Every structure is written in C-alpha cells, then in structure tokens.
A protein has these predicted regions:
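Short acidic low-complexity segments
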Residues: 125-135
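ATP-dependent helicase/translocase motor core
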Residues: 1-98, 107, 111-123, 136-140, ...
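Signature of the SF2 helicase/ATPase Hel1-core->accessory helical subdomain module
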Residues: 149-154, 160-179
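Conserved residues at beta->alpha junctions
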Residues: 74, 103, 171
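A short hydrophobic beta-strand->loop->alpha-helix junction that borders the nucleotide-binding pocket
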Residues: 102-106, 129-131
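Short C-terminal domain-edge/linker segments immediately following a structured domain
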Residues: 22-28, 131-133, 171-176
Length: 179
C-alpha cells in the first residue's frame, strides 16, 4: 500500500505515515495563507548583500509553490546565519512553525543550536542528539541524520509525518539520509 497526502497547495505526494489530526488542521489553515510578503531581514542576523539575496530568492522560490530548495554557499559565507534569517522570515509570515535542523556531525548540530538560540531567543530549542531531558514540543529541533533515523525507526513515534514545516539539511552532500 502507499499513502499520499493531498493538501490543495502542492501536487499530491507519497508520505511515510498518516498525518495526525493536528497536522491536518494545520494544513487546512495553510490553504489560506498568502505569499511571503514581509521580506524584512534582521541585520543583526544577516547583513551581507549576497546573504539577503539568497533569502529573498528562496522566499520567491517558495512563493512559486516549490516545496524544496537547495542553497549552495562556500565555506565561511554564513550559511547558518542565512538559515536562521530564513526561519525568522518564514515564521513571521506564518509559513513555518516547527523546524528540524539536520547535520552529519554532532559538532555542527551543537554549533547550529547555539547560533539559533542566540539569534532567535524567543524560539524554543531542543537538541535531540544530546543526552538528558528533551523538549519534544520545542519549535526548533537539532540532531544528526542518524539520530533522526533512530527516531523514525523507533516503536514509539515521537514525531508525526507532518510535524516539521521546514527541514534544513546542513552539509547535504555528505547526507546518508536517503529515506
């Protein structure tokens, strides 16, 4: 059997599991959302022209009803800050509520979590790769690919099929996340 989701925004597509009632209610709300119109970029997060251009281009791409995008930037050009600004713009425009940040190494996960927490202090964060107590209701989740694979394969499903509105994959070229 196969499960497909038809949300009225994007073409129908296969999904791995059924969406929860909360996921479906959020989808219904999203049907009436408008384009991303408030492209105000916080200069304290990103202030370089090429970073702002990247954020604007991604928002225009999403407004054109594309579900996926790829941002390729050289080392040291502020990819994490661009991701933070993008999350900021998308949350202010009510396009995303829950974000998953994936990376191939724990050090990248830790660094991203620290930067997001510092630059978006009003958003709750949780690092799933770390030990200790976890806030599974946090709006920003951070983990390695392998940690998320373990959560997907676990008997006790922590995350529904529609839990994350935005998934950011750092170092995608190294990704083993082929599901």
């Amino acid at each position: 059997y196969s499960i497909k989701i038809i949300d009225g925004i994007y073409p129908d597509r296969p999904v791995m599991a059924f969406h929860t009632m909360e996921d479906l209610e959020l989808m219904l709300q999203r049907r009436t959302r408008g384009d991303i119109t408030d492209l105000t970029i916080n200069d304290e997060i990103t202030n370089r022209p090429y970073q702002k251009m990247a954020i604007t281009n991604i928002c225009e791409w999403l407004n054109a009803k594309h579900r996926r995008g790829l941002l390729v930037m050289a080392t040291g050009t502020g990819k994490t800050r661009v991701a933070i600004s993008l999350v900021d713009v998308l949350t202010r425009n009510n396009w995303v509520k829950n974000v998953l940040f994936l990376a191939d190494r724990t050090s990248l996960v830790n660094q991203a979590k620290r930067n997001f927490a510092k630059l978006m202090p009003n958003m709750s964060v949780c690092e799933l790769s770390a030990g200790g107590e976890k806030d599974f209701n946090a709006r920003l989740m951070f983990c390695t690919y392998q940690t998320m694979i373990n959560y997907i394969d676990a008997e006790d499903k922590r995350f529904s099929a529609g839990r994350f509105d935005l998934i950011i994959i750092d170092e995608a070229h190294r990704s083993i996340f082929n599901r």
